[in-house]
A protein has these predicted regions:
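Patatin-like phospholipase
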Residues: 2, 7-74, 79-438
């Protein structure tokens, strides 16, 4: 007698009881869903995120950053998650973005972002003669004061210094290779790249229904168009700029998608210059030399603005994380970010690419240190989602982000040692120059 026949011979109550449990069994999830949200932070932010993810992936059994369920990226974080969603691993990102030793077609060249926005300059410059004549006419007729008349010239100012058109072009080429796609709708996982509509101030979740017709590469370009640095990006007749203008993380996009575990990476934090300095993490697994860190005000306007910017975006993120905890009490949220007492990430230039190897190694080692110090709490939280700490990897103090895959030759070891010495020397000279200037 099959199940259908047996149900017909049951009483009414027995049939209702049996039917009640069938759909519940059918809808039971076979595995937890995991999402990743990456905040922005310029080249420095991307460098930190690559180094941190390399440490996380090798230290956490059961976590594969290329096989998550939902990816959310803002600004520089959009570049990283778009690559992960296309199957490019953190180690491959490290090879192309940090080490520059991948295939030429996949190597990131920072010069892409340093080309002047000639088109913007020309377009705005062509407006200048008419604006000048209009201002002079107002002054001559006494309609406006000199300062008021000069305000008419503001439309001639470029909206961005550099062109980020290469972001769209290069990433479109990168995602056109076999096994990858530049179409949100063809990805195996969900990908959301958040930009900000310049005219309305609303968030634009590219990749969500109604927003998924836009090429991934163009969405990355829009999400990373920092006002003043890059011109706004026009998509479907609307102008879009950096997604961080609205929120720092935008993790709620994935949390609303009912994920079980939310991993968030935030690369920019305000520096606590009053705390005892935390400088244990370093290149060769040894404590870094202690350095005298000047007060924020002693660094002049750039330092004050940097601290202000970091404090503003971090306070927004803290409020967002508190909201997530109350709004999604059954979800596990893990935040990874630099230590506020660590001067290494603070002293680095947010838009610098020169120190990428040193900073990526620092992020890698600091993340490993964080996992060791928080292993008790993290183990319990991660275990619910089938993820465990790899203690052998975490306890191996000789591991490095850029360690060669095989034993180097004598010449190779000499070159590696020389490179380390030169990196240390460059950092020492830069620090001395900063201290001397103050």
């Amino acid at each position: 007698m099959d199940r259908r026949t047996s149900l017909l011979h049951c009483s009414k109550n027995e049939r209702l009881h049996a039917l009640h449990f069938v759909p519940m069994h059918a809808n039971t999830k076979t595995r937890p869903t995991i999402a990743l949200a990456l905040a922005g932070g310029g080249p420095l932010g991307a460098i930190y995120e690559v180094g941190a993810m390399c440490a996380l992936e090798e230290s956490l059994n059961g976590l594969d950053f290329t096989k998550l369920d939902h990816y959310v990226g803002v600004s520089a974080g959009g570049f990283i998650v778009a690559s992960l969603a296309n199957g490019i691993s953190p180690r491959e990102l490290c090879a192309s973005f940090i080490e520059n030793d991948s295939e030429p077609s996949e190597t990131f060249d920072p010069s892409w972002l340093l080309k002047p926005a000639y088109g913007e300059f020309v377009r705005r410059g062509m407006m200048l003669p008419g604006l000048v004549l209009s201002a002079l006419w107002d002054i001559t007729l006494g309609r406006k004061s000199l300062m008021s008349a000069l305000e008419r010239l503001s439309p001639a100012l470029p909206t961005g210094v550099f062109s980020n058109a290469a972001v769209d072009t290069k990433m479109a080429q990168l995602f056109s290779r076999e096994g990858r796609t530049n179409d949100f709708r063809q990805l195996k996982a969900k990908l959301t790249l958040v930009a900000t509509n310049l005219d309305s101030g609303d968030s634009a979740p590219f990749g969500s229904p109604g927003w998924d017709h836009v090429p991934i590469s163009q969405a990355v370009q829009a999400s990373s168009a920092l006002p003043g640095l890059f011109p706004p990006v026009m998509i479907d007749g609307q102008y879009y700029v950096d997604g961080a203008l609205k929120k720092t993380m935008h993790a709620s996009v994935a949390l609303e998608d009912q994920v079980d575990l939310m991993i968030c990476l935030n690369p920019l934090v305000p520096f606590d210059a009053t705390a005892r300095q935390f400088t244990k993490v370093m290149q060769r697994g040894l404590p870094a030399p202690k350095r005298e860190i000047p007060r924020i005000v002693d660094g002049g306007l750039p330092s004050v603005l940097s601290q202000t910017f970091r404090s503003m975006i971090h306070s927004r993120m803290e409020l967002g994380m508190k909201h997530y905890t109350h709004a999604y009490p059954k979800k596990d949220i893990i935040l990874i970010e630099p230590d506020h007492r660590d001067p290494e990430m603070y002293l680095a230039n947010t838009f610098s690419y020169a120190q990428r190897r040193h900073l990526a190694e620092h992020a890698y080692q600091q993340t490993r240190q964080m996992l060791r110090s928080r292993k008790t709490g993290l183990s319990a939280k991660l275990a619910k989602h089938g993820i465990t700490l790899n203690h052998d990897v975490l306890d191996d103090h000789k591991r490095h982000l850029s360690a060669p895959p095989k034993a180097p030759t004598r010449i190779g070891r000499a070159i590696a040692t020389l490179q380390e010495v030169m990196d240390d020397l460059g950092e020492t000279v830069a620090t001395a120059a900063r201290l001397t200037a103050h």
